[in-house]
């Protein structure tokens, strides 16, 4: 079965504006969600809440010193294991990572022509914008323009640009969300590689690091050279495999830091947390297996619903 996210569970532009809340488009939100699912501290917080504060002796012994901070994040973000990102986003994520109100955007209030002049109904729609949508977008400075459509795109755009330059104001800054991204400019590919390595290490706990690197596809130079199941280390490939091991080790270390920081409400950050828990691939192998089983059933259910 294809485990790709079903179309009905993919985030659309309209999902960034729901119930008086809005957020900017950012792939980092999805990665935060995915990496929380691979955080040992977050998993322990989930277990603690589900078991009404009761933990085994083993779990008590490994509970981090800042566990209360992790519990606070878990209480906000909730269980991220057995639901699609869209479900989590619409129910929790938007209010945690977004802010009240809409983002300002360019709108066509009405179009007038000789055949269809600016009548009272069109003017009413324009007034309606200023009594509703304008306030919902935080009362931005706006220009009401009459743009002739018969002067050509290039001339019209040039004149509009000149007016914008003439009346430019400070760029809009949305209200600070409850959880703000720690680094909006972090390279997405680097984060995806970290996620892939952490996930693959859990999916294949017996794999050596170079095998994890092959399966995670973190290196254009080395990952494609080897097969994780059939390649054997020898004098001819030892140096290349060593380089891949080093790359995978760095990504694995960074991924553990990112996941544990995410559990403390800090994302994305590769800094080593002061009280991070150890990542146990065997433990998360069971968690991933349960998640895959759930996802297969959920996709099948969605497909059946579409078919009916």
For each of these PLM feature ranges, what is it?
Residues 1-175, 301, 305-308:
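Intrinsically disordered, low-complexity acidic/Q/S/K-rich activation/interaction tracts characteristic
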Residues 172-308:
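K/R-rich mixed-charge low-complexity regions
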């Amino acid at each position: 079965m294809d485990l790709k996210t079903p179309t009905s569970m993919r985030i659309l532009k309209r999902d960034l504006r729901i119930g008086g809340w809005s957020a900017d488009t950012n792939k980092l939100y999805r990665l935060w969600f995915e990496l929380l699912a691979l955080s040992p501290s977050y998993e322990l917080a989930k277990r603690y809440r589900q078991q009404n504060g009761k933990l085994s002796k083993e779990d008590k012994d490994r509970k981090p010193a800042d566990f209360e901070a992790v519990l606070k994040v878990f209480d906000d973000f909730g269980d991220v294991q057995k639901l699609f990102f869209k479900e989590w986003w619409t129910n929790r994520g938007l209010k945690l990572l977004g802010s009240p109100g809409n983002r300002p955007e360019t709108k066509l209030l009405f179009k007038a022509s000789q055949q269809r002049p600016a009548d009272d109904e069109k003017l009413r729609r324009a007034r309606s914008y200023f009594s509703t949508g304008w306030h919902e977008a935080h009362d931005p400075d706006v220009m009401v323009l009459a743009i002739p459509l018969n002067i050509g795109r290039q001339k019209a755009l040039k004149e509009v640009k000149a007016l914008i330059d003439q009346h430019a104001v400070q760029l809009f800054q949305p209200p600070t969300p409850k959880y703000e991204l720690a680094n909006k400019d972090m390279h997405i590919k680097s984060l995806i590689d970290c996620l892939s390595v952490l996930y693959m290490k859990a999916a294949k706990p017996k794999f050596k690091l170079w095998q994890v690197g092959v399966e995670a596809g973190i290196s254009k130079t080395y990952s494609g050279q080897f097969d994780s199941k059939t390649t054997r280390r020898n004098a001819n490939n030892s140096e290349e495999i060593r380089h891949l091991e080093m790359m995978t080790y760095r990504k694995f270390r960074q991924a553990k830091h990112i996941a544990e920081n995410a559990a403390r409400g800090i994302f994305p950050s590769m800094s080593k947390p002061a009280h991070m828990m150890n990542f146990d691939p065997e433990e998360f192998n069971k968690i991933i297996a349960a998640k895959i089983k759930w996802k297969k059933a959920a996709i099948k259910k969605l497909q059946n619903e579409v078919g009916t």
